[in-house]
Every structure is written in structure tokens, then in C-alpha cells.
A protein has these predicted regions:
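A structural motif
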Residues: 1-135
Length: 135
């Protein structure tokens, strides 16, 4: 039986470079990105957190943002400080979940959906494109 957990997400940086986010068997969330669009890859780099599921999207301003579940189900996210740049670091969204995914609204705001431990569908969206979350 295949695991229902999503262990890979692919994003596109504003300059066209692909970036892959993935969870290896040891549970550590890693990423790798192209040096230039359509070129070779940089090499695997740990994001310094353990996860069991990952999803990602691009903010309206071009910064990538990832959402993930920790091994104990905490819903967290991390984002680039500038398009194609360094990452902020783990931030909890103060919720627990069993599954998650993210998509962009027509106006560019990212909206996160997750199935809570209670089995209910929850969501959280940005208040404005590339902005803070509704919470």
C-alpha cells in the first residue's frame, strides 16, 4: 500500500530555476535547486527540520513558501526572505494535522488546507498577496 503522505514538492523561483523539496527516509526535509534555469542542480541541502509531508507554493512577489507536517503532526511553514534567497526558518502555525496542501487564490494569496486530527478540513490564507497569514 502506498503512503498517502506527500514527500516531495516542486517550486519555480522567480528567475525560472526549479527547486525541489523532499523528505528522505530519515525524515529530514531537504531541498535542491538548479544553478540556472534548465541547468545542473546545486546539491542537496537540509532545511534543518524533520517532516512527514510537504507542500509548496510561490508567493505573488516570487518568494517560495513551503508548508509541512512535523513527525508529530504540527503544521509549520518556511519561506524565502527574498525571491531565490535564504530561508526564514521553521514557524509553527499553531495547528495539528494529518494531511495538507496549498494553492494560490486568483488574487495571488496562498491558501493552506489541512485535515486536522479531528478529521475536519481547516484552512488559513494570507491577508494580502505575499503577506501575513489569517491565523
Amino acid at each position: 500500500m502506498q503512503s498517502p503522505e506527500k514527500r516531495i514538492a516542486i517550486g519555480k523561483n522567480r528567475d525560472g530555476r526549479l527547486e525541489a523539496f523532499y523528505i528522505k527516509p530519515d525524515g529530514v526535509l531537504r531541498h535542491n535547486w538548479q544553478n540556472r534555469p534548465n541547468s545542473i542542480w546545486k546539491g542537496e541541502v537540509s532545511l534543518g527540520v524533520s517532516a512527514r509531508q510537504v507542500a509548496g507554493g510561490a508567493n505573488a512577489d516570487g518568494r517560495l513558501e513551503i508548508f509541512y507536517l512535523t513527525p508529530d503532526g504540527e503544521v509549520c511553514h518556511d519561506w524565502q526572505l527574498e525571491p531565490g534567497g535564504d530561508w526564514n526558518g521553521k514557524e509553527s502555525l499553531g495547528a495539528d494535522g494529518r494531511a495538507l496542501d496549498v494553492s494560490s487564490n486568483a488574487d495571488g494569496r496562498l491558501e493552506l488546507f489541512w485535515v486536522g486530527r479531528d478529521g475536519a478540513l481547516w484552512h488559513d490564507r494570507q491577508l494580502e498577496p505575499s503577506g501575513d497569514r489569517n491565523g
